[in-house]
Amino acid sequence: MTSDEKSATRDIYDPNTLPDYDREFIEPDDLRQFEKALNAPEAAPLVALNDWRPVNQRVRKSRRTKPRRSKDETREGVLYTVLKWPFLFTVFAWITVLGFAYTLTRLYIFLYEQFVTWRGKREQLRRELSMQTNYQDWLKAAQALDTYLGNLKWKETDEYAYYDHLTINKVVAQLKQTRKAAEMEMQNGRPGLSDPPAVEELCFLLEACVKNNFAGVENPRLYSETYSGTKDLVQEYIDEVHSCIRLVLDSKQISNEDKYQFFKHLDTNFGRTALCLSGGATFAYYHFGVIRALLDNDVLPEIITGTSGGALVAALVATRTDEELKQLLVPALAHRIRACHEGFTTWVRRWWRTGARFDTLDWARQCSWFCRGSTTFREAYERTGRILNVSCVPSDPHSPTILANYLTSPDCVIWSAVLASAAVPGILNPVVLMTKKRDGTLAPYSFGHKWKDGSLRTDIPIKALNLHFNVNFTIVSQVNPHINLFFFNSRGSVGRPVTHRKGRGWRGGFLGSAIEQYIKLDMNKWLRVLRHLELLPRPLGQDWSEIWLQKFSGTITIWPKSIPSDFYHILSDPSPERLARMLHVGKQSAFPKIQFIKNRLKIENAIMQGLQQCSSGGGRVMSPILSRRRQDRAQEHADRMVERLDQSFPERQSDYKDESHYAEVSDSLSATSSRPHTPDARRSSMFEEMRRQSAVFFDDPDMYADEDAVTT
């Protein structure tokens, strides 16, 4: 090791090299406001029986102190009462038997792969692959392993059952031909002015093929047969589409307005990519390595969501620039992770007194450094351009979850959302979300309601991301320990092909994979039966079935490989050496997915660059769906302002009605002179007028959303 390498190694363990290491971002007043909101009594509705009965009537205190289930959860009937607990114990006993059988099956598959498939030269190449610390060296080792296993022949063959190779061949040929014709016109001019330019035909072709998973080119199976890359035809298609998009962007034969509309269509059809970081207590520190691998290869998506421990990592990423992240994601970061610094006697006394192991105010102080103080979701987006999303679950089991971001809660303070997303019952009590007012002070958000761990219901909020940001391609970094135990891809995963029969077989043979799938599906079935029959108890007032039954994977799922000691340190701060290992493992788990992500973002970034260059402002441009959502919100706010003015000044309404009457008479006279009488048009205009009038009393912007979607 040279002197420069030794110096670099010392630097990554030196906490003084971290940006803002000694800086405390949060203000003491912010913590005092947060403490005040936590200690505030729960708001209770005031209801009087009638005009002469007092509101706060003194009633006799109930003798019952033990909490009971609410009325709507109580099941009537003799059979339910008699059979509930015997059936519950029987199912749990059967699940225990299935769990033991599943453990034996996984042990058999592990031994089969270790002693039957991984031997000799291939085992040596695989060990070299796992020792690489950067993507370039890893890619060379992966290509060497593919060459030894004979995977290059699979890349050269176009036919494959999981995508339409005939369609892709035709599209590539047409794109090449049209692109060359457009390039000739750009150099030599158009031969005939009456014919449409070739670049317009190229736009029509791109609008037809630039779609999410067009003809199956984004099927993960296309990247699961080799350690590096995919089919040569698929790679050729990706490169050709990118070249054509660049040509349209540079063309002078299309106006900027037409280009902007063109890229809006492509963005809507192609969608966006999001990085989803799961929860998992201190297992979430594996996310740091995943982030570092994506950052070093320029494939870190702009949309990031995190839950529980993943929310802390996502907040760090969304509030820092790329240069700051490269300095922060090193082993020295462990010196700033102090959430579990208290001793055994301290947290035991707190748990006995409050029901929570950790102190909420101390966690708020520690968490604020990762969020740059009381930064809001909007401020983070304006600083870095990244869209942060945090899943929060209300303490009330019947209320819906929220996905906090700069659209749904722009002024919400990030560290309060991170604490709420990490508030596991028994670990941290439910917390109040805080919002930043115009004067910079903090106040309770959402009427002071309390929130808790988002992993309990929505660890990976795929539906909400699609609703708000048109996300249809998700990169999930999954580190939940109770899910990792059951992770198994019988046919391999992206960049991790099956070792059996040169990647064409099943892990552990077909019989081993079949038994594994059957046992896992049977356990899942019985858990669903218990949930739908409402037989599961609710410890700490929470339905815990969703921590097993929700979807935990995405289009690409990254599973960092944990070790047994991680379970022992599940609620303890990492040392620099332990964090260095987690960074290495996280990067290693992300390397096989880099090429797939590069191909996806290659087209997506080209589309977003086209939107940015062709927009009138020329600045940062959000997706058209996001801009439309902002416009709708601004219009709704303006409509409510007009309504308040009308209520305050009645004479304004009468003047407006008179003016609108004269305008309608004038429009009707001009309409009768220019076009024939159309009863259908008049009927529709009458319904439109009724709808506008009803909106004054029923101001619901979603009332006619479906009708507008059909008519547009």
From Swiss-Prot:
Biased composition (Basic and acidic residues): 1-13, 632-646, 652-664, 677-688
Keyword Transferase: no
Annotated ranges, domain PNPLA: 275-466
PROSITE patterns (alphabetical): PNPLA
Gene3D superfamilies tied to this protein: Cytosolic phospholipase A2 catalytic domain
Mode of membrane association: Single-pass membrane protein
GO MF entry, a single one: triacylglycerol lipase activity
Motif (GXSXG): 306-310
Localization of this protein: Membrane
Compositional bias per record (Polar residues), positions renumbered to this chain: 667-676
Alphabetical list of SUPFAM superfamilies matching this protein: FabD/lysophospholipase-like
Keywords: Hydrolase, Lipid degradation, Lipid metabolism, Membrane, Transmembrane, Transmembrane helix
Family: Belongs to the PLPL family.
Function noted in UniProt: Probable lipid hydrolase.
Name of the protein in question: Patatin-like phospholipase domain-containing protein AFUA_1G04970
